[in-house]
Amino acid sequence: MVAVYFLLGKNSRRISFLLAASYFFYMNWEPAYAALILTSTVVTWSCGLLVERSAGNERRKKGFLIASLAINFGILFFFKYFDFFAESVFALLSALGLRMQVPGLRVLLPVGISFYTFQAVGYTVDVYRGTIRAERNFVVYALFVSFFPQLVAGPIERAKNLLPQFREEHSFRPAEAAEGLKLMLWGLFMKACVADVAAEFVDAVYDNVPNHGGASLLVATILFAFQVYCDFAGYSCIAAGAARTMGFRLMENFRQPYFSASIKEFWRRWHVSLSSWLTDYVYIPLGGNRVPFLRHLANLLVTFLASGLWHGANWTFVAWGALHGLYLVLETAARRFAGDAAFPRRPAVRILRIPLCFAMVCFAWIFFRADSLSTACAVVGKIFGDRGTLFETNASFWLCSLLGIAVLLLKDVKDRFGKGPLLLHSPCGAVRLAAAVGLTAWILLFGAFGSRAFIYFQF
C-alpha cells in the first residue's frame, strides 16, 4: 500500500487513494456503517464552511455549530447510548412501582464511532472558535475523518495537526519508513507479548469471579492494568507507525503513564488525545479552574464522568470515570489547602508516590474490567477480605508474561527517566538490526496470536 501511495505521484491522486483505502478498511467490519462516517463527514464539513461564512452573524454562526453537534452526538447517542438509558429508565420506573416497557434497539455498535465523532466535532468547534480555517477540499477533509491508521481506535487527531499534512507533497524517506516500521514492531510486541498474554489469566479470573479468591483477583487486576495499557498503546504505536511510513505524524497518545506520581500527571500521560480533547471541549467551556473553587471541583467531576461515558454505555464505566474524577477532586483540594506539603517535589518522595498512584489506577481498573457494578464490588470485597489461593497456571505463562512486562517497563523507564536511545534506536545500524530481529523472534516465539481484538475497538 505504501508503494502504491508513493507511485501515484500527484498529491490529489494519493489523497483519493488513501480515502478509498480508508473506507474499504472500515467496510470490512460492517459495510452499511460507512454511511455513518460519510454522514458525519458531510455534516461537519458543510457546517464548518457555513460557520466560517457566518462570521458577521453570531446567531447564525452558533446555529450551524449547534446543528453539527446535535446531528453528530445524536447519531452517537442512538447507536451507543439509547439502550443504556432506556434500560436505566426502565429500572428506575420499576423501582418506583411503575410497570412501563421502554423499548430497546439492540443495534450493533459501529466500530470506532466515539473516535471519529469526537474528531469531527472537534473540527467544527475549532472552526467556530477561529482556531483553524474551514477546509474547502471535501476529499482532504473526508480523509481527515476516516484516515485508516487511526480511524477505529485513535488517537483522536486535531485538524490543525493532520489537515496540513494531507495538503503537503510527501516524498519517500527511508529513515521515516524505518521509524514507522520500528513503531509498528514495538506496538505488535506490546499487543502480542504483553496484552494478549496477560489476557489469558485476566479473562479466566474475571469471567468467573465467584470461583476465585482475592489473591487471584488482585493479580488479575494488576495484569489487566498492563493488558489495557499495552493493548491500547500498542494499537496507537501501530497506527502511528503505519502513518509514519507514508510521511504522516500522528500525535503521541501515551507517555509512560504508569510512572506518574499523581493522578493529574497520569491523565497527562494516558490517552493523551482524549484527555486533551475533554480539556479543550468540555472542561474549559465549563469554566475550568477560572471559577469559584467548588465549581472548579464540579467541573473536574463532570469532565471525568464524560470520560467514563465515552468509554462505554455501562454503569461500570461511569463508576470508573467517577473514581478518577474523585481522585482529581481530592488532589486538587489537597493542593489548594496544603500546598507543596501535599505533594513534595523531593525525588525520593516522588518515587514513593509512583506505586501509590499505580495502586489507585489499578483500583479503578476493577470497575473498568468488571461486567457489572455488582461484580466489581464482589472483586473489591474479595481482594480486601478473602485472600484465597492464587489461580494456578503453567510456568510458561508466568515466564512469558513477566518477561514481556519487564521489557516494557525497561523501555518506559528509559523513555521516562533515562538519556540516550535504546537498542531499536541505537546510532549503530548493526545494533538496530539485531534488536529488530530479536524483537521479531520474541513476538513469533512467545506472542499470543488469536482472534482477540483490540479492547478499544468497542468504543
Model-assigned labels for residue ranges:
Residues 1-458:
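Membrane-embedded transmembrane alpha-helical bundles that form the catalytic cores
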